[in-house]
Amino acid sequence: FTTIEALREFDPAFINVTFHRESIKETLTPDGHIEWHRMRRRPGTVGISAAIRDRFGIEVVPHLICGGLSRYDIEDALIDMDFLGLHNVLALRGDCGPNERHFMPHPQGHSHAIDLVRQIAAMNRGEFVDGEVEECHHSKFSIGVAGYPEKHVDALDAESDLRHLKAKVDAGADYVMTQICYDADRILAFISRCREAGIDVPVIPGVKPLSTLRQLTLLPETFAIELPEALRS
């Protein structure tokens, strides 16, 4: 909570809470078989989000990802969020898992963020993974998706990347949160291209405060972005 305390003086409208995949640990059983166990050594996204909201009174936007989760896992997380009054969610595919060269979805999960958006939108209509429909209870999630002013690293080109974003909005996304970008001109150009493509939902620039010089090298490598020369110097 120390980091949140330092941000309070700026009166943030909301705080994003990222989602980290659980670690996988293999153990050897006495009979020589290998067992895989999912491990987590810190609180999860839902718990952290509720704690920040309740302790500081700041709106939170928990991230929810496809990676490592089945549709039922995702549904459980959404049920908890809805019960706790966490009604904003950023729907993402997520990064590759450990030792993965390419993204590998859970066998019962989603391959793309658009499918996650569809699942959340379905829950807003009272529709669940097993086909049951609850007419008396609909969740009220506001769904955010990621946009990439500098193109997603896996996209063929900027045009196809924008088409994917338009599809996510058409599937039920209420707003776009951009990938980290420190170039105002690039952000404005991206928003202009979104409007030309028929994407009329709000587009919120994503900015991460820089706290160390090392991040000037680490962030471009991690997020496939460019830093303006003025910022580097």
Residue ranges and their predicted role:
Residues 1, 13-17, 60-64, 89-91, ...:
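Hydrophobic faces of well-ordered beta-strands that scaffold small-molecule active sites
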Residues 6-43, 94-108, 173-190:
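Glycine-rich, proline-tolerant flexible connector loops at the mouths of alpha/beta enzymes
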Residues 94, 107-140, 145-154, 161, ...:
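Active-site pocket-lining/capping segments in soluble small-molecule metabolic enzymes
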